[in-house]
Design a protein with these regions (language model features):
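Tandem repeat scaffolds
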Residues: 1-145
Length: 145
């Protein structure tokens, strides 16, 4: 395993790179070529991937806690089991992404573009709650109308 802690990758050509069992904690990726990219069992806690194009990359099971994902493109990504707790997600593109089993905060549900994303039932309830929806069968008028 390797560690690139608090490193700055600027305009790096990372396409075809493979990171396995790697700690990238606090590192910043700016204008990097990142596809295709292999990331397995990596810790990307506090990493900045703002504006990164990672469409279609397998990010399943990765630790992305408190990552900066603002305006990143994760369209079609496999994020099953990923930890996105506390991630900054304004305008994060998660179109057609698989989010089942991932840990997600209300801020991501509010800030990301999620059309076609696959989620668990529990996640759908959290999404609804983040958007202020009330889920339940209690009607004030008893359902008569």
């Amino acid at each position: 395993s390797s560690a690139f802690v608090s490193c700055t990758f600027e305009r790096a050509a990372l396409h075809g790179a493979s990171f396995e069992g790697c700690r990238l904690t606090g590192s910043t990726f700016t204008e990097c070529r990142t596809r295709p990219l292999t990331l397995r069992d990596c810790d990307l806690t506090l990493v900045s991937l703002a504006g990164a194009n990672l469409a279609g990359v397998d990010l399943s099971g990765l630790r992305l806690r408190e990552a900066n994902l603002v305006r990143a493109d994760l369209t079609g990504c496999d994020l099953r089991g990923a930890d996105l707790s506390g991630a900054r997600a304004e305008r994060l593109m998660l179109i057609d992404a698989d989010l089942r089993g991932s840990r997600i905060d209300a801020a991501l549900w509010m800030g990301a573009v999620l059309s076609g994303a696959r989620v668990d039932i529990d996640q759908a309830v959290l999404f609804a709650a983040a958007h202020g929806l009330s889920i339940g069968g209690d009607d004030a008028d008893g359902g008569e109308g």
